[in-house]
């Protein structure tokens, strides 16, 4: 409720790897860490991040336990100029840092329960969406963007080839070009259908 009760269109970034340490304290955890690859983070008011449960010395507790933690914007810092990768500037990925933020228990959940689809029991939600294992949901979220990129690239290629001339005439009349465009289109459509 906290995340979407006031703004149903609230966005969150998710540098998911458990790069931080969550030290148990009364009513929750004290969270510290630095996460890389937080795509789109400038546009988000929340993070969903991974953290290891730590002991009082800040070392991973045994047995090993990982959490998924929700962190509101005032509790993290975006590190500007931390993403300098050729061809991926548009992702808006940056590092984020959390230093000593208190995370109430209700904003953390055992990552193993999310992975196996049993986290819904603690959330009080019983709809099918909440019973799905993370491994069934996450790939769809990532592949949707990739399919969109592929469709955009195909449209651009078709537009570019439309009036382009090659050694043997218009490339739009070239059977090899038509075959390549057709194959790309079929691959994209079949990916969307699965």
Where in the sequence are the language-model features?
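C-terminal helix-coil-helix/basic helical segment that borders enzyme active sites and/or dimer interfaces
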Residues: 192-194
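Beta-strand-enriched cores of mature, soluble protein domains
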Residues: 27-29, 55, 89
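DPxDG-like acidic metal-binding loop motif
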Residues: 34-77
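Active-site glycine-rich loop that binds ribose-phosphate moieties when present
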Residues: 14-16, 51, 71-85, 90
